[in-house]
Amino acid sequence: MVRLRTLVRAIAAASVLTSGMAHGLGLGEITLKSALNQPLDAEIELLEVRDLGSGEVIPSLASPEEFSKAGVDRLYYLTDLKFTPVVKPNGKSVIRVTSSKPVQEPYLNFLVQVLWPNGRLLREYTVLLDPPLYSPQAAASAPQAPVSAPRATGAPRAPQAPAPVRTTAPAGSDTYRTVSNDTLWEIAQRNRTDRVSVPQAMLAFQELNPGAFVDGNINRLKSGQVLRIPTEQQMLERSPREALSQVQAQNQSWRGSRNPAAGSAGARQLDATQRNAAGSAPSKVDATDNLRLVSGEGKASKGADKGGKGDSKAIADTLAVTKESLDSTRRENEELQSRMQDLQSQLDKLQKLIQLKDAQLAKLQGQLGAEGQGAAQPNAALPDASQPNAAAQAPAQPGTPAAAAPTPAPAGEAPAAPAQPPVAPPPAPAAEKPPAPAVPAPAPVQAAEQPAPSFLDELLANPLWLAVIGGSALLALLVLLMILSRRNAQKEKEEAQAFAADTGEEQEDALDLGKDGFDDLTLDEPEPQVAAVAPQVEKTTAQTSDALGEADIYIAYGRFNQAAELLQNAIYDEPQRTDLRLKLMEVYAEMGDREGFARQENELREIGGAQPQVEQLKSRYPAMVAVAAVAGLAGAKLAQDELDSFSLDDLSLDDSGHAAKPDAAGQDLDDAFDLSLDDLGGDDVQADLKSDSGALDDLTLDSDLDLAASTPADKPVDDLDFGLDFAELAETPSQPKHDDLGDFSLDLDAPEDKLSDDDFLLSLNDEVPAAAPADNEFTLDTEAAEEPALSLPDDFDLSLADEPTEPAAPEKGEDSFAAQLDEVSAQLDELASNLDEPKSATPSFSAEDAAVASALDGDADDDFDFLSGADEAATKLDLARAYIDMGDSEGARDILDEVLAEGNDSQQAEARELLERLA
């Protein structure tokens, strides 16, 4: 059973592996489009969708059990996530992940489950959420101005993207001409690739176009300048951390040059955009803060004079926006300060989590890439954006381990507008110190991004190999199952044969009944002339061993009908097989088919050579013996009707009218007298009858016939088998004629002795002479004795055709008899050779012979009455015990019920006891 379960599991695993890889649906990377404190908006790419529709792909959050197996906490706010499959017009399918509430956690770790018609997918995703630092709507209302202040105002607009977005440079163009209100952040964002962060692109533009910036500061881009667009390789010359540090340093330098009187109490840029939650907050300012306009120091740009007219209007607009946002920022300042402490602790935990998840993410995602590094940059600059009252924390932050977590944009790298309240710039050494320690080696990251494919990866990427391996494994398992099933079947067959053999022996022992009530049963001895056939039966037993073996198996399981059918088919093929017929007799005895038992017994008698086995079966199944005897009588009647035989069995006649020699009683008597008159020629018999009429002295027929036979004293009879030579019969004119002899009885002079009632078949359709010599007297006496000694059945027909006293003149009825005798052929010569005794010798029957015949007759009557009265009930009890030993409870109950109805008190008590045992 354990092996079978293991095989089933292996087959199921191979089937799942083969069918799942055949379709090839997969989950790609996740792309984040929202920031912290905003409703989640992300997309998960679907790979190898092929012909699947949106309705066939069902994504959802995994079950708690799957979270538990993966070792991931299933937090409550994850239940707000909604997964929607989207098929885009370009054929690219994604799963859109959204939430109805703003996400206030810095990162999300969850399992996505995707169901489709051919299988199921599970994948873990970790999303880092950055706080929104700036929105492009901040300076939407500001007019265009050629002065440097408005140009610098647009610089902070770029950090709106929290995660790197794939952008491509304009096709067919390697340069870009700046216009009014352009910022380097926007230009760099439009021309960078996914692997390049915005700070890296900004510094690459500055390095390639140094003359386009005032004082070499990225926040002072000149209008109308033609910028050469750097390549991706040039943008990747600096690491994201180093580029971020340099951008922060230039932002602080630019703020310091713009606000020299602000001192060390530098304030953060204010975010005047409308959003649900403020992404940053400035430090507290004194109530005496004032706003004053200053001109930019250093060289002016070439287009600075052109925008002088719009300066006043731009400043007024910016001042109005600043005043509106100042009140709200003051109210949120205290709340943000407390939240920053929480965020700092969460960042520390996040650093450890990222270190632990690096290996797992590399295996599951396949490519880590610069996208993760770009996403970690805002977190690195988060302390600088959220702690305005600690100016020294900004340069120190990149040196901490938190800088390893990639974030998309730096915090506070550009001022809001000239209308900003005056703040003091941080010390110069603090601004220049961060770049030094922030020089990580990007080589290990790129090595992790593109690991060398292993053999297992190549195998999993090739569905054909997977199908071949799965099919081979399945075929091997099927072959193994077939071998095991054949072995089990062979083992079961051997066990069944062994069980059948043991059961057959037990049944033979159980059904081997004793000879309790059958000691006085006398059966006919087997004919001596066919006793030599037995060795032939043993010689050919092996030819039908298969049929006998199968029959034994059916018998052991109680399927007697199938066993009988099998044996009948085998007998039909080999009708001379006595062993098959013996086995069929045994099956009939088990089934209670008495007619079949008797029929097979008669056939075995005709074949010969199996009489001892038949007697053994009769002793085992005594209930079949009476039926066999009745079948024998029926066969005798049939033979009598067909005029096929003349039989005289166990005939013992006593000469009551004449004295017999005493030594005649010591003769060895033979109980069988069989005379076959089959195929006798009628013409020859008539000729013999006419040629000699002195063989029979006296023949008297009446409704009740008494037969008295006498023999000369000087001629003893050695054997009761004698032949009748119809040529020696003499006519008897004084003998009366009878048209019909319905009752034919032979009465002996001794009234107390009975002869055997064996078949006495005598069919003589010819005239019998009435006279015979005195020394060969054979008299049929019409005087009735005191009681009949031998009574034959009513249908016993001994017909003697009426004839006139003169045999030479037959009546008309003899013409038909002669016509019938014309058809007799083969056995006349053989019969004539056997009937060679002297004409004057007739059988001699003594008183002792009659006594022996009477005793045999009485014994036979007693033997055939063994099923009457109490003997029948006792036999049924024995049969019931045999059925119980065989396990046939139903058959035993039926027999015991009959014993309760027919038996005496002791037998009924024993039957009840057996029934209680069966209950």
From Swiss-Prot:
Signal peptide residue numbers: 1-24
Region span, Disordered: 140-177, 237-312, 372-445, 785-816
Positions in coiled-coil regions: 319-367
SUPFAM superfamilies the record matches: TPR-like (SSF48452)
Disruption phenotype: Mutants are incapable of twitching motility. In addition, loss of FimV dramatically reduces the levels of the PilQ secretin multimer through which pili exit the cell.
Mode of membrane association: Single-pass membrane protein
Regions of compositional bias (Low complexity) in chain numbering: 140-171, 390-417
A GO cellular component annotation in the UniProt record: type IV pilus
Polar residues: bias regions: 245-256
Transmembrane segments: 464-484
GO terms, molecular function: peptidoglycan binding
Disulfide pairings: none
Domain LysM: from-to ranges: 174-229
InterPro entries assigned to the protein according to its UniProt record, in alphabetical order: FimV_C_sf, LysM_dom, LysM_dom_sf, Motility_prot_FimV_C, Motility_prot_FimV_N, TPR-like_helical_dom_sf
Major localization class: membrane
Bias (Basic and acidic residues): 299-312
Locations listed in the record: Cell inner membrane
Biased composition (Pro residues): 418-443
UniProtKB keywords: Cell inner membrane, Cell membrane, Coiled coil, Membrane, Signal, Transmembrane, Transmembrane helix
Domain notes: The N-terminal domain binds peptidoglycans through LysM motif. In addition, this motif is required for PilQ stability and multimerization. The cytoplasmic domain contains three discontinuous tetratricopeptide repeat (TPR) motifs involved in protein-protein interactions.
Xref: PANTHER family: NUCLEOPROTEIN TPR, NUCLEOPROTEIN TPR-RELATED
Subunit organization: Interacts with FimL. Interacts with DgcP.
Physiological role: Inner membrane hub protein that plays both cAMP-dependent and cAMP-independent roles in twitching motility. Regulates intracellular cyclic AMP (cAMP) levels through the activation of adenylate cyclase CyaB. Plays an essential role in a number of virulence mechanisms including type IV pilus (T4P)-mediated assembly and twitching motility as well as cAMP-dependent virulence gene expression. Also mediates type II secretion (T2S) of lipases and proteases. In addition, mediates the cAMP-independent localization of multiple T4P structural and regulatory components to the cell poles.
Protein name per Swiss-Prot or TrEMBL: Motility hub protein FimV
Gene: fimV
